């Protein structure tokens, strides 16, 4: 069995306690690994990463995993006892079967993949599997083909219409993105967005989507009377540099002469909770340019009703979990209370995940401003959306 291990957040130890203590801790960890039961070979691989080859003859995987977990806890306890740091933990990647017919380079690569994945696990331990490797290959595929895909315009805008609760017609749409691969396969966002977020590339995609959406707004303004409001998503990465984001966005809005009355930007409830100060700062700037901001996924597990009276959002988008399954009497009461508070604080209400006539009728009766969901429309491509808008709402300028 091959183990590859690293120290969680080791850079913080160096920054706070200094490189000398950091090196002392690494030497200590290395000695403890050399004393690991049935160890054949152990050593420092690079930086704060260690490797160890363990003889697990006659041991099943579960027993080995328990042994690793026990050893990691023991090392952590000893480090905390011998050094003045307050937190210490390790990530461990496991390659269990060294008898498989793979060369050393591949085995090390697979173990390293498991180590990186271990950072996402609560216990900090992950074993290599074929499924894990396939996920890693898909991740690499996304990263290596992303820039080329942008240049080739493989990312397509999709639109999910929103229906007015009063007029029962399309008044706006949420802009979504799909990736049409070179082989024609269309990827949903969950195939590539998490990877782009993790690697800091989602900002490029966001601004690609914004520009494509603004170009569409210009085109439809020239072809039809009236305007369709578009909702665009803001990724959490932009909260790291509010000034740069808003400056770039406002320049793009000015370039295409976009009437900001027809723009809404959505920020998820979870992003707001994690970046409250930055989000409020962004909202203040957006409001100066008459741009509305919507809280997306409200009620997905973070906010309380009390927070609604204090937030500066113009619109609140109720999470579809409120409408999952049938609307119970208790569910109706909760939604009524939320609607009542939102109306009193002057916020617009959008409900997503509307999938039944029962839900639609109830929401309209309670004064929901806009409804979105499969009962009305699934996300549709640009051409189909244009046809829907043309038939449902738009009047040609020649009339």
Residue ranges and their predicted role:
Residues 1-2, 8-34, 43-47, 51, ...:
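Conserved long alpha-helical elements within nucleotide-processing catalytic cores of c-di-GMP signaling
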Residues 165-174, 199-279, 353:
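Catalytic core of bacterial c-di-GMP phosphodiesterases, primarily the EAL and HD-GYP domains
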Residues 30-34, 63-82, 209-219:
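Alpha-helical scaffold within the catalytic cores of cyclic-nucleotide enzymes
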Residues 30-59, 291-295, 347-348, 357:
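Conserved helix-loop-beta segment at the catalytic/binding core of cyclic-nucleotide signaling proteins
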Residues 55, 182, 235-240, 262-276, ...:
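EAL-family c-di-GMP phosphodiesterase catalytic domain
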Residues 138-195, 233, 295, 351, ...:
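Active-site core of bacterial EAL-family cyclic-dinucleotide phosphodiesterase domains
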Residues 1, 44-55, 80-116, 121-129, ...:
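A short glycine-enriched loop-to-beta-strand structural element that forms part of the catalytic core
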Residues 98, 104, 113-158, 196-200, ...:
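C-di-GMP signaling machinery
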């Amino acid at each position: 069995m091959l183990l590859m291990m690293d120290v969680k957040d080791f850079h913080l130890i160096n920054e706070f306690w200094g490189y000398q203590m950091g090196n002392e801790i690494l030497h200590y960890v290395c000695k403890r690994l050399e004393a690991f039961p049935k160890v054949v070979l152990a050593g420092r691989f690079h930086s704060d990463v260690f490797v160890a080859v363990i003889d697990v003859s006659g041991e099943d995987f579960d027993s080995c995993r328990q042994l690793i977990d026990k050893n990691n806890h023991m090392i952590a306890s000893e480090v905390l006892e011998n050094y003045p740091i307050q937190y210490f933990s390790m990530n461990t990647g496991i390659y269990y079967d060294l008898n498989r017919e793979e060369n050393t380079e591949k085995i090390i690569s697979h173990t390293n993949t498991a180590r990186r994945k271990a950072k996402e696990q609560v216990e900090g331990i992950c074993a290599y599997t074929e499924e894990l490797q396939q996920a890693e290959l898909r991740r690499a595929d996304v990263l290596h083909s992303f820039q080329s895909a942008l240049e080739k315009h493989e990312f397509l805008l999709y639109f999910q219409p929103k229906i007015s609760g009063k007029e029962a017609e399309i008044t706006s749409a949420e802009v979504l993105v799909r990736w049409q691969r070179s082989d024609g396969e269309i990827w949903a966002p969950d195939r590539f967005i998490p990877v782009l977020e993790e690697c800091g590339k989602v900002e490029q995609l966001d601004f690609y989507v914004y520009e494509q959406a603004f170009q569409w707004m210009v085109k439809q303004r020239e072809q039809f009377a009236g305007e369709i409001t578009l909702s665009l998503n803001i990724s959490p990465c932009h909260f790291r540099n509010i000034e740069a984001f808003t400056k770039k966005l406002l320049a793009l809005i000015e370039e295409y002469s976009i009437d900001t009355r027809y723009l809404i930007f959505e920020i998820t409830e979870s992003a707001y909770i994690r970046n409250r100060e930055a989000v409020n700062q962004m909202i203040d700037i957006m409001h100066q340019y008459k741009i509305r901001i919507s809280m997306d996924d409200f009620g997905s597990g973070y906010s309380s009703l009390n927070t609604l009276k204090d937030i500066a959002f113009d619109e609140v988008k109720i999470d579809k979990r409120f409408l999952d399954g049938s609307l119970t009497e208790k569910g109706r009461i909760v939604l009524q209370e939320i609607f009542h508070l939102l109306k009193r604080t002057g916020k617009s209400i959008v409900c997503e995940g509307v999938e039944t006539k029962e839900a639609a009728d109830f929401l309209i009766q309670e004064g929901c401003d806009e409804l979105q969901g499969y009962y009305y429309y699934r996300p549709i491509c640009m051409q189909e959306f244009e046809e829907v808008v043309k038939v449902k709402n738009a009047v040609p300028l020649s009339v």
